[in-house]
Amino acid sequence: FGGRVMGDGKPKYLNSPETKIFDKSRNLYGLNIARTTRKKYLILCEGYMDVISMHQAGFTNAVASLGTALTSGHASLLKRYTQEVLLLYDSDEAGIRAALRGIPILREAGVNSRVVDLKPYKDPDEFIKNMGAEAFEERLNQASDSFMFRVSIAEGEFPMEEPQGQNRFFERCAEMLLELKDELERNLYIEAIVKKYRGQY
């Protein structure tokens, strides 16, 4: 059993006690339906209500963790059904942090990831209600490469109008590039960063 409070009560999520059969870190809500989808990717959301809203709108390849952060167990489970996951967390600070935490976990499991930008809306339900399923599909298609998403977030952490801030930003980019073990992949991202920021700073 898994439940979510509809108001502001606590705890936000309430699940049955964990057993050998029910392990939150190795189960995904909606996977029983999503795994049969013909889409080439699965969409990872924050919670039950996101999945329900998306399935109602026709996006049946959406899943969510059971009120917990993404784990290596979740990533391994996703790997069994897809090579690519779209991270679709809320557009607030907590959602951004969750995406940043999830990217390396998925990468370690051998799953490619992209990040969907829902702004100016907070979550999938709000976006779909205001913009419709077609516009939502377009946002999915525009999902950012996960590495370049990290680069964009890093850019916002430094005073880019100052040379020192620019220097610290590019040092951060270099650190992230060194995390990439594959030389070809690293060179491709170097080119992508140069292309994006050439002439800006």
Q: How should these model regions be labeled?
A:
Residues 74, 93-97, 101-108:
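Glycine-rich phosphate-binding loops that contact phosphosugars or nucleotide phosphates
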Residues 81-82, 103-105, 130-137:
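Short, hinge-like loop/turn segments at secondary-structure boundaries
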Residues 84, 90-91, 134, 141:
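Histidine- and aromatic-rich ligand-binding microenvironments
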